Amino acid sequence: DYDLVVIGSGPGGYVSAIKAAQKGKKTAVIEEKDIGGACLNVGCIPSKSYLTHAQWILSAEQANQYGLQVNKETLDFAKMVQRKDQVIQTLQGGIKQLFQKNKVDYIEGLASFDQEQQLFVNGEKISYTNLLLACGSHPFIPPINEVDKADYLTTDTFFNLEELPKELTVIGGGIVAVELAFAMKPLGVKVNLIEVASDILLTEDSVARQTIKKKLQQMKIDVTVQAKIEKVKKDAVVLSNGTKKYFDQLLIATGRQANLEVPQQLDLELDEVGHFVKVDQHYQTSKKGIYAIGDMIGGFQLAHAASAEGLRVVEAFCGGETYPVDQNMIPRCLYTDPEVASFGLGEDEAKENHDVTIKSFPFSGNGKALASAETEGFVKIISEQKYQQILGAVVVGSHATEMIHTILAVKESEGTVDELADIIFAHPTLSEAIGEEANSIIDQAIHG
C-alpha cells in the first residue's frame, strides 16, 4: 500500500512526491507519457532553449552596431534541436535520480479507476491511502472553420519540428504564442500572429504590452488583432476581410484545458462551468483523500504554481498547518526581448480597493543598462499610500524574470517600500533600478 500515489510527473507531481517521501511517506508516481510533464518536454524548457538561440543571434546583430563584426553565415537548426533534446534529457535524468535518492517508485503507464475507485496501471492494481491528481492539461483547439483540414501544430507538437519553416502563422496572441514568435523570427522565419481578441497579451500590464508590441513591429513580425477567421486552408488562414496569412507551418496556441479523464472516472465535482476540478483550501477534492493541483484546478497555469500547491497538499495530509497559495504572490514571466515579469495586483485592480501610489523608473536612467545597451523597459511598483505596502510590481527589461524576485521577497516577508528602499544595491547593476524606484515612491530618489 502506498501512502500517496501521484498521477502525473510534471512540476506539481514530481515535487509533491519527493516532498512526501522526504516526510516518510511511501510514495509512487504514475506517468503516462514523458517524465517531467508538459513544462519540461513541450513547454517552459524547450521554448527557453530556442529563445536562447534567438537571443544569441540578436546579440550578434547588436554587436555589429558597436564595432564588432560578427557574421551569421549559416544556421544549423539540427544542432539547435540536438541541444534542446540534450537539455530535456538531462533534466529528465535529474528527476529520475531524485526519485531513486528519495525512494519514490516511478511507474510508467496509464492510470485508470473502476467504480470502487480502485487504481489500475498496466492491468495491475495499486493500493493507495491518498491520491494526488497532477494530470496537467492539453492544448485547446478553438472551433475554427475547416481547421481540421489543416496539418496544424500545437504547443505539444511544435518542438518536434526538425526543419525551420519558411513562414509560420500562429493563431493566438498569448504568452506562448508571442514567446515563440520571438524565438522563430531571429532564426530567419517569417512570423504572422493572429489574435481574435482586442489585443495580444491582455493579461499583461498595459505599458509592458505596448513595449512588446513595439518590439514585434521592429522585428517585422506581422500582428493582426480583432481578427475574424473565416476558415483555414491548406496553406493559409483566411480572414473575413479577405486577407490571407500564408504558412508552411500553422501553430495553434490558444491556451490549454485541464485533463479531466481521471476526475471524471472518480466522479469528482467540477467548478461551475465544468472546466476545472473543484478543491477546498487544502486542495482536497469533493472526495476525502483525493487532492488536485496545477492546471487541473484553474488559477495561474504555471509550473511553479503547481509545485507550490503540491507542497501545500503534502503538508496538509502530513498533519501540518497549511494555507492555500496566494495568487498575488505568484510571479508571472514573459521571456520576450525585453522580458516582462510581474506579480500581485495590476494598476486597475489596486485602485479598486486602495489609495495607491504608482511610479516607474526607466532603465534608460541606469548605468549598467546603458553600458550593456539594455535600456528598454522599466521598474514599476504599485503601493498603498498610507503604510507603503507593496501591492504589485512589473519589471520590463533585460533579466526582468530574475529581478522580480527581489521585490517579491520583500513583499513575502511583509516588508514595505521603505524597506525595499533601504537595501544597498551593488553598482553597477540593473537591480539598482529597483532601489531607485522604491526611493522615488517615498520621495527620496537621487537619480529619479
Describe every region a protein language model picked out:
Residues 2-29, 177-186:
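N-terminal Rossmann-like FAD-binding beta1-loop-alpha1 element of flavoenzymes
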Residues 148-164, 245-317:
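FAD-site-proximal beta/loop scaffold in flavoenzymes
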Residues 41-42, 46-125, 202-227, 234-235, ...:
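N-terminal Rossmann-like dinucleotide/flavin-binding domain of flavoprotein oxidoreductases
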Residues 44, 135-189, 194, 266-267, ...:
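Glycine-rich dinucleotide-binding loop and its adjacent helix/turn
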Residues 5-7, 111, 126-136, 171, ...:
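Short hydrophobic core segments
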Residues 81, 86-92, 159-160, 165-169, ...:
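Rossmann-like dinucleotide-binding cores of NAD(P)H-dependent redox enzymes
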Residues 7-10, 21-33, 38, 45, ...:
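Flexible, glycine-rich terminal cap/loop adjacent to redox cofactors
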Residues 108, 112-120, 126, 187-281:
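A Rossmann-like FAD-binding core segment of flavoenzymes
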